[in-house]
């Protein structure tokens, strides 16, 4: 990063503030500063005053959440207000056609594209159930409606020494409303081109003795957005050639105006054409290529870009003193939500079908291979229902004047049911094509009826229905022939978290510079993850375990064997804050200096032990105008249960892998046997983070606040797959010296009877593959998760805020916050030829942490307030990036910088508050990056595809 730009940013802010300070100020009576209350912020368990916080925490208030102009989705609010939330792991409603970032309608947040811990009221939440069927492992922040949030604390620093696993990039802590008095209801409606959203809420709270209870009801709806609704993603050609009317792998297609060969040729027992060439000669088919077929088909009307979503939620929190002695207090919270989402993909296609001779619609006198069947009016729909429940109950009290204690239990659960509709039931497809029955159900050669299974089960009764014409387009199909062919796969998954935590906090003693703070804590939690498809979605036979037998019957569906695993984690931490210099001493250069230290030890029943320390300082050299702070921390990321114990996927690996692994060797596409999935020997990934920064509040410019924090994080041993091509290349190059030599065998999978590995000498694997086409079919390769990857991040988080109150012209507030990436590099494997990929300033799909990472990303607001009127203009700015393609090294394409402006006006009548606004006033669409984001031509997560959005909100307080 050009550090001169950081200097320019600070200098410009100072100059602007100094100029503003020259304006006349409203007179205010001098007042003695009140004693600041003690608070506990995310990242520390020791209370401190707000001006003495040693960790970089950014707080978003409820007012800021509302002023963002975004609906109730926490991800979208955070991504807009805090630019550090960027990278493709910040996945949400824009995941509508991306199964690689499968969140089942949920929303994931990650600071600086790094693993980030999500808390509610300082405690953990169960991960999404989709993780049990090879989806993303994340906490769904969509279950936390904005209307229920009091504020959000975002710690941009490693914090495993306090919280344990996952806090590598930082922590996001959602603090729920807990002391609301009265009743408030509100609604929001928004509309844009081909898109709309609305939400409504009610929040009520009341004192209960010396305590209080608060509850919020919320409902929100967002419309789907189709690819065909936006010019940058429509028309969208070249995505698939698996279309109805194609045969021979899309080398031939039905001629224009012909919906089926039966319209022009005798079929079945009456067929006369001896070959496909004859059908080409008589004009039934015309030669083409897969590329030409794909180039003529616009897929955009068939796919959603943003999913449809309906979310209902209830949240509540309470704080009830139950005994004056020792200030014993009962506290807790509850969240219940149901999220229903829908997304649409292109219709499923069954490729490579061989139509038997004498089948009723076969136009040849022989079997007809290579036929593609698809029915375009039947899209592949996903209906996800996620029900989330979380309950916390605890007690807190005083041991003495200097010591307090707190203990709580948490139960959290995420239940997913996914229904994938319009999948093809494989056993019935062959029966439907073969026909062979008359209308009375009697076997007849070439009969136009089929006997198929009902209930999508081989044990279901047979039913007679019209035979299927697999050659036909939708217009040529016989009514009734699709019955019992298209069905729905049902997937269920559950994630559970049960935890207990306790801590004591107090003053260990007093040094000349002040009190020594100490916190001691312990936790025990149990995590459980389970998932299963219906019987037709299994990978293996439920009785014999054989691959592909009595299983994998949903064409286009999700395949997974039943899975269930759990683990227990116990941990303890200690944190201490030691003041070494006091402002009362008035020592030059050391007006105030505090050291903080923490360490946590955790034991995983499956992944062993982790011990992580943290050291930090807070230093005020002269006075409160300048505060310097820094931290050194170790963190860790435990492997998720699915990566360790999830079902393995044994399959035929596509033929493209071998020629890609050995380019220029003339090897044809050759499929081989592959197995990928879990690895029970995974260990936690580890990281080292270093942060240093400052807070500047210059006395010569009142109400100016500048912050800058530099972060350097080195994450090692991240869990990722090896890649079949990497395994083959490594063994061929290094022979038995390859770290993956044990992952390959012939005859059977490594470790099984009949398996052997004759490739100990470099080069012998390539020689073997060149020896004959059948040799690849005898290869058995295991690609499982490994602790291989490394990531190094270097970035700045900067901010500036300035306010000026005038005597007659109201109050002006100018604020900006930004994320500036110096470097973000990723190494997938420690192998020859593998180098670090640079993500910063690029858009790429390479590796695990792909996506768009602009070097400069800022969000700036200017607010004018006069009495009860508030006007705001906001700008989101992202610097230009380079589209480097799917592998990170393609010839680059420039992606233009992005800037969008928002306007908002609000008026508060006391009991009634109304606001109107326009997001993205100039209707700026996402800049094109077609190589990396081939599904939509642009990154629709980093850059919203909604365009101009008009909205209005109303809140009534009763």
Q: At which residue positions do the language-model features occur?
A:
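N-terminal Sec signal peptide and the immediately downstream disordered periplasmic leader
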Residues: 1-83, 205, 391
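C-terminal beta-signal and adjacent terminal beta-strands/loops
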Residues: 705, 714-716, 820-825, 874-884, ...
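Short strand-turn segments of transmembrane beta-barrel domains in outer membranes
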Residues: 153, 180-205, 297-307
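C-terminal beta-barrel architecture of Gram-negative outer-membrane proteins
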Residues: 649-651, 810-908, 922-923
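N-terminal periplasmic accessory domains that precede
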Residues: 75-77, 107, 140-142, 166-187, ...
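Short acidic/polar hinge/loop motifs at secondary-structure boundaries
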Residues: 107-108, 123-156
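Surface-exposed, low-complexity loop segments enriched in small/polar and acidic residues
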Residues: 133, 225, 229-238, 271-309, ...
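Extracytoplasmic beta-strand/coil segments of soluble accessory domains associated
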Residues: 27, 78-125
């Amino acid at each position: 990063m050009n550090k001169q730009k950081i200097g320019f940013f600070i200098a410009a802010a100072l100059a602007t503030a100094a100029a503003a300070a020259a304006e006349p100020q409203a007179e205010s009576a001098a007042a003695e500063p009140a004693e600041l209350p003690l608070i506990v912020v995310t990242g520390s368990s020791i209370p401190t005053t707000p001006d003495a916080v040693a960790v970089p925490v950014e707080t978003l208030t409820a007012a800021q959440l509302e002023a963002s102009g975004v609906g109730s989705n926490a991800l979208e609010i955070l991504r807009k207000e805090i630019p550090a939330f960027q990278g493709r792991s910040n996945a949400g409603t824009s995941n509508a056609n991306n199964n690689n970032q499968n969140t089942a309608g949920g929303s994931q947040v990650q600071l600086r594209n790094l693993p980030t811990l999500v808390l509610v009221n300082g405690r953990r939440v169960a991960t999404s159930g989709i993780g049990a069927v090879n989806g993303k492992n994340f906490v769904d922040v969509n279950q936390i409606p904005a209307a229920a949030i009091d504020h959000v604390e975002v710690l941009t620093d490693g914090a495993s020494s306090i919280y344990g696993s996952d806090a590598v990039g930082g922590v996001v802590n959602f603090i729920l409303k807990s002391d609301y008095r009265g009743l408030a209801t509100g609604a929001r409606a928004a509309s844009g081109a081909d898109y709309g959203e609305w939400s409504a809420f009610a929040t009520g709270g009341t004192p209960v003795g010396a305590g209080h209870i608060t509850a919020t009801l919320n409902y929100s709806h967002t419309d789907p957005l189709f690819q065909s609704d936006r010019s940058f993603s429509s028309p969208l050609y070249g995505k698939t050639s698996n279309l109805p009317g194609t045969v021979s792998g899309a080398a031939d297609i039905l001629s224009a105006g012909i919906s089926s060969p039966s319209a022009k040729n005798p079929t079945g027992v009456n067929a006369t054409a001896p070959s496909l060439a004859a059908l080409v000669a008589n004009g039934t088919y015309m030669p083409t290529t897969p590329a030409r077929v794909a180039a003529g088909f616009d897929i955009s009307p068939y796919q959603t870009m943003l999913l449809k979503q309906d979310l209902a939620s209830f949240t509540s929190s309470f704080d009830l003193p139950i005994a004056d002695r020792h200030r014993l207090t009962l506290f807790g919270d509850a969240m219940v939500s149901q999220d229903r989402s829908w997304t649409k993909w292109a219709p499923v296609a069954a490729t490579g079908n061989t139509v038997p001779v004498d089948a009723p619609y076969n136009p040849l006198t022989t079997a007809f291979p290579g036929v593609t069947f698809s029915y375009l009016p039947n899209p592949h729909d996903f209906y996800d229902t996620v029900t989330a429940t979380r309950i916390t109950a605890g007690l807190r009290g005083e041991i003495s004047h200097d010591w307090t204690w707190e203990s709580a239990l948490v139960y959290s659960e995420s239940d997913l049911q996914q229904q994938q509709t319009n999948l093809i039931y494989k056993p019935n497809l062959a029966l439907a094509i073969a026909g062979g029955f008359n209308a009375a159900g009697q076997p007849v050669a070439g009969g136009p009826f089929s006997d198929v299974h009902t209930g999508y089960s081989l044990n279901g009764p047979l039913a007679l229905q019209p035979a299927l014409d697999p050659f036909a387009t939708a217009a040529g199909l016989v009514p009734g022939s699709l019955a019992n062919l298209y069905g729905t796969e049902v997937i269920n998954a559950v994630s559970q978290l049960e935890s207990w935590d306790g801590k004591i906090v107090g003053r260990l003693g007093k040094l000349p510079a002040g009190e020594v703070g100490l916190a001691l804590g312990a936790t025990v939690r149990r995590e459980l993850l389970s998932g299963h498809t219906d019987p037709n979605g299994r990978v293996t036979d439920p009785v014999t375990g054989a691959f592909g037998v009595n299983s994998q019957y949903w064409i286009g569906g999700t395949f997974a064997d039943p899975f269930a695993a759990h683990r227990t984690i116990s941990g303890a931490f200690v944190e201490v804050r030691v003041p070494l210099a006091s402002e009362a001493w008035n020592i030059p250069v050391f007006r105030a200096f505090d050291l903080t230290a923490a360490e946590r030890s955790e034991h995983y029943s499956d992944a062993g032990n982790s011990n992580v320390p943290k050291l930090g300082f807070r230093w005020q050299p002269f006075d409160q105008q300048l505060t310097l702070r820094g931290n050194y921390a170790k963190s860790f990321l435990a492997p998720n249960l699915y990566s360790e114990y999830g079902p393995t996927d044994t399959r035929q690996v596509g033929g493209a892998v071998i020629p890609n692994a050995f380019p220029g060797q003339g090897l044809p596409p050759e499929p081989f046997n592959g197995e990928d999935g879990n690895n029970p020997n995974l260990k936690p990934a580890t990281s080292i983070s270093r942060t240093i920064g400052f807070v500047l509040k210059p006395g010569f410019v009142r109400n100016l606040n500048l912050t800058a924090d530099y972060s350097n994080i080195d994450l090692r041993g991240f869990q990722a797959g090896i890649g079949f091509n990497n395994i083959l290349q490594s063994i061929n190059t290094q022979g038995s010296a390859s770290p993956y030599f044990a992952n390959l065998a012939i005859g059977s999978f490594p470790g099984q009877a009949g398996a052997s590995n004759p490739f100990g000498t470099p080069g012998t694997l390539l020689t073997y593959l060149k020896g004959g086409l059948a040799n690849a079919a005898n290869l058995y390769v295991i690609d499982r998760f490994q602790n291989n990857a490394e990531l190094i991040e270097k970035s700045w988080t900067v901010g500036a805020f300035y306010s000026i109150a005038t005597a007659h012209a109201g109050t002006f507030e100018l604020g900006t916050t930004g994320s500036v990436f110096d470097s973000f590099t990723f190494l997938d494997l420690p192998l020859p030829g593998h180098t670090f990929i640079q993500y910063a300033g690029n858009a790429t799909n390479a590796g695990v942490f792909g996506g768009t990472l602009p070097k400069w990303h800022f969000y700036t607001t200017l607010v004018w307030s006069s009495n009860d009127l508030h006007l705001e203009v906001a700008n989101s700015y992202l610097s230009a990036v380079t589209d480097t393609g799917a592998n990170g090294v393609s010839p680059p394409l420039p992606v233009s910088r992005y800037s969008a402006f928002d306007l908002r006006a609000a008026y508060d009548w006391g009991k009634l508050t109304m606001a109107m606004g326009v997001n993205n006033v100039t209707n700026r669409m996402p800049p094109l990056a077609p190589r990396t984001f081939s599904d939509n031509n642009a990154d629709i997560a980093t850059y919203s595809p909604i365009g101009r959005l008009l909205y209005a909100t109303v809140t009534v307080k009763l």
